[in-house]
Amino acid sequence: MPSKESWSGRKTNRATVHKSKQEGRQQDLLIAALGMKLGSQKSSVTIWQPLKLFAYSQLTSLVRRATLKENEQIPKYEKVHNFKVHTFRGPHWCEYCANFMWGLIAQGVKCADCGLNVHKQCSKMVPNDCKPDLKHVKKVYSCDLTTLVKAHITKRPMVVDMCIREIESRGLNSEGLYRVSGFSDLIEDVKMAFDRDGEKADISVNMYEDINIITGALKLYFRDLPIPLITYDAYPKFIESAKIVDPDEQLETLHEALRSLPPAHCETLRYLMAHLKRVTLHEKENLMSAENLGIVFGPTLMRSPELDPMAALNDIRYQRLVVELLIKNEDILF
């Protein structure tokens, strides 16, 4: 007979997992699949196999959602599901409405980041609660920023944290920090190390003595983002703020622009600007002022959504100014 303690623990686990009416229906079907008696042996085999497949798929889903519970200190970033049309092998049930997914091909859609399986029509009603599974997120570079931090359950991308820690531990006095380029082949090695080993990647001085390789890897990460750190949607607001002459109005508009960024992007930008502010405190040694860093990071963090090359070219000076303002006013804006 189970103890009172183990029983209360199981009740807590159930409360964590069963968050919706639909999931309650799934649990009922799961219990039926795992424990019901089905009469004759022949009919048992006929009905048992699809139920067993369903039980496995639903149990996997429930376990995944329970184990991916985020640490309370980690912000709960919203992320939309990355649904793609999918052909399922064998019987499958929708994880939203718990109804059978009929058809032989393209029975529904599957989230490429977390593996959620739903009807195409149900996908429009699924909340923005995608919790990417590491088995679906194969790389670090060129991966959507919010997808990466939710998959690894971190506040910021590991690349940003690890590179900045390494740079601040041994490179703040390096002349031309971020302006001087490192050897491109070694920068590519760092990229592959992060894609292969994640947070276990070795970027220490024993592996890469030249700090410019680490700064190059950090800049490459931001350049490779499919959605820039300062997103396409927020881009016009930042450019407009840079054009304002009045300093107070300019900072107020810039603050409003920051609020339009996705939370994971805003947190990463805040952390980066705080780091670049510390870089400017060593300007006598590294010769990198906020203006110089703006020239380097402007085009790296911001990409114009306009296809017109002339319009994008005209924005370069404002991109530089945006980053310069963010660095100088980091303690006020964030």
Curated annotation (Swiss-Prot):
PROSITE patterns: RHOGAP, ZF_DAG_PE_1, ZF_DAG_PE_2. Residues 1-22 are annotated as: Disordered. The modification Phosphothreonine is found at T67, T215. InterPro entries: C1-like_sf, DAG/PE-bd, PE/DAG-bd, Rho-type_GAP, Rho_GTPase_activation_prot, RhoGAP_chimaerin, RhoGAP_dom. In neurons in brain regions that are involved in learning and memory processes. A zinc finger (Phorbol-ester/DAG-type) spans 80-130. Residues 143-334 form the Rho-GAP domain. Disulfide bonds: none annotated. Phosphorylated. Phosphorylation is EPHA4 kinase activity-dependent. GO terms for molecular function: ephrin receptor binding; GTPase activator activity; phorbol ester receptor activity; zinc ion binding. It comes from the Eukaryota. Keywords: GTPase activation, Metal-binding, Neurogenesis, Phosphoprotein, Zinc, Zinc-finger. SMART domains: C1, RhoGAP. Residues 1-10 have a biased composition (Polar residues). One of its GO terms (biological process) is ephrin receptor signaling pathway. The record marks R179 as: Arginine finger. Interacts with EPHA4; effector of EPHA4 in axon guidance linking EPHA4 activation to RAC1 regulation. GTPase-activating protein for p21-rac and a phorbol ester receptor. Involved in the assembly of neuronal locomotor circuits as a direct effector of EPHA4 in axon guidance. PANTHER family: CHIMERIN FAMILY MEMBER, N-CHIMAERIN. This is N-chimaerin. It comes from Rattus norvegicus (Rat).
